[in-house]
């Protein structure tokens, strides 16, 4: 459910988008906002949500779909290692591939429960992830991905808000 904090943040982001000319800068603002406001900040404190040598951090970014190449390219990311800027993922890889194929949102509150989960982040395996497809004029153009290392960071209510941010 959208709370007043999220509504105010969306208002600010939309106002910012109307004044900024660089699309990637606008999308980076969305990535940063989602990392700051979505997810359970106490998830990392629950026993079992972090494994040995893991620490809580989050990432977000947009994978823009390139249908001619059957892949998606990472842009406007927050928290990803610098060497993964413009990372390209084939359409058939992991859960981003599932979203590309089905064009539906996907929530993995605990990635350990999915034996087919593929590690995309070069530096760590994430424990909780949200994927929201993006459309323009009814056409699939990519997806917004947000992930955290602690399992159970993201719940249904976070994913619903994530989808609202994505549709802006």
Residues of each region from the PLM?
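A short, aliphatic-rich beta-strand micro-motif
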Residues: 127-135
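Signal-transmission/dimerization alpha-helices at domain junctions
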Residues: 1, 37, 101-107, 137, ...
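Flexible loop/coil segments at beta-strand boundaries within sensory signal-transduction domains
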Residues: 68-69, 135-140, 149, 160
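Regulatory sensory and allosteric helical modules in signal-transduction proteins
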Residues: 65-119
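Signal-transmission linkers at sensory-effector interfaces
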Residues: 1-29, 36
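Short beta-strand-to-loop transition segments that serve as allosteric relay/switch motifs
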Residues: 79-80, 127, 143-153
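Short, hydrophobic-rich beta-strand element in sensory/regulatory alpha-beta domains
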Residues: 25, 32-66, 72
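Regulatory loop-to-helix N-cap segments in sensory/regulatory domains
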Residues: 1, 85, 115-118, 147-164
